[in-house]
Amino acid sequence: MLTKLFLKKKFEEYYSKNEVELPRKFKNREFAFVPLELLPDFVMHRHISFRSETDFRAYILSNVPAHIYFSSAYYERPAEDKMENKGWLGADLIFDIDADHLPVKAQSFEKALEMAKREIKKLTAVLRADFGIRDMKIYFSGGRGYHVHVHDEEFLSLGSAERREIVDYLRLNSPKIVVEDRFANSNAAKRVLNYLRKKLEEDERLTSKLKIKPADLKKEKLTKKVIRAVEKFDYSALSIYIDAPVTADVKRLIRLPGSLHGKTGLRVTEVEDIESFNPLKDALAFGDEAVVVKVARKLNLSIGDFSGKIYPGRVKLPEYAAVFLICRGDASYDS
């Protein structure tokens, strides 16, 4: 109980002192909240809308949330309980890269964030180069990954089927590169072929290994040698491991920028420069005032300016580190 009271006080202080970034056309969005006081039960209160920023701030200060979400969709009546009565008007295109969904599992929180960063860089490069997307924002999720919000008008009206095609293109789900003796005419196949052609042009050793040349990939009718080479080439480095259901869902709830992630105490933070961004420094929401916590097991922790081993028992930590461990369930508040 003491730990929850401490956490509620800290979250309330954060929201009283900091502005939270309301989404575009927020009056047409559904909001959802997980009350902190109900933790560890994850109880979501949803189908909520706001007419003003003042109303929103009053709500979160009187109902301190552990998590805040908003809908990717725009609605005529966002507060309606039944989805079919909301009046769907369109939805932002959302991408979620979470370290938990990557094929290689990280051994630490820090490594997970590094892996997610590499993946988000691949994603945004393809979105710009292949889709011509310019109006998008990158956010650190507050957890183990990143979100991309695309606001380009031409994507707003896409249904789930069209969004799944984008997922297939990015993840290369069964691209069917070769059909009989010709290259498939799908966007995913073209993406793979462009990648292979570029690799062949860059690396003569690959040309020798596969026994084909870049020009062979431009021929209308393919030889068996070219087909075999294309089909056995490893394209895994080209696949981007986005969370498919998030992108395909036209009514998805996504974390609100500027809000706190209840399982880390980190802030959902806009990323201006992905190269230099360090979530364990740049997404800290709390100060460095000393807080005493009780730790149950030996830990290695690197966050903010703190780095080192932590042993079981009473430990004095900077506030941001204490909140992080408490939210993750690795420590309890000890007054």
Curated annotation (Swiss-Prot):
- The top EC class, named as a word, is transferase
Q: Tell me the name of the encoding gene.
A: priS
Question: What protein name applies here?
Answer: DNA primase small subunit PriS
Task: State the family named in the UniProt similarity comment for this chain.
Answer: Belongs to the eukaryotic-type primase small subunit family.
Molecular functions (GO terms): DNA-directed RNA polymerase activity; metal ion binding
Q: How does it assemble?
A: Heterodimer of a small subunit (PriS) and a large subunit (PriL).
In this protein, the active site sits at 96, 98, 243
E.C. number: 2.7.7.-
One record GO biological process = DNA replication, synthesis of primer
**Pfam assignment, any one:** DNA_primase_S
Which HAMAP family is this protein grouped with? Answer: DNA_primase_sml_arc
Please name the InterPro entries in this protein's record.
DNA_primase_S (IPR002755), DNA_primase_ssu_euk/arc (IPR014052), DNA_primase_ssu_PriS (IPR023639)
Taking the record's annotation, the residue ranges forming a coiled coil are: none
- Organism of origin is Archaeoglobus fulgidus (strain ATCC 49558 / DSM 4304 / JCM 9628 / NBRC 100126 / VC-16)
Cofactor requirements of the protein: Mg(2+); Mn(2+)
Describe its function.
Catalytic subunit of DNA primase, an RNA polymerase that catalyzes the synthesis of short RNA molecules used as primers for DNA polymerase during DNA replication. The small subunit contains the primase catalytic core and has DNA synthesis activity on its own. Binding to the large subunit stabilizes and modulates the activity, increasing the rate of DNA synthesis while decreasing the length of the DNA fragments, and conferring RNA synthesis capability. The DNA polymerase activity may enable DNA primase to also catalyze primer extension after primer synthesis. May also play a role in DNA repair.
Which terms are listed as keywords in the entry?
DNA replication, DNA-directed RNA polymerase, Magnesium, Manganese, Metal-binding, Nucleotidyltransferase, Primosome, Transcription, Transferase
Q: Name one GO cellular component term.
A: DNA-directed RNA polymerase complex
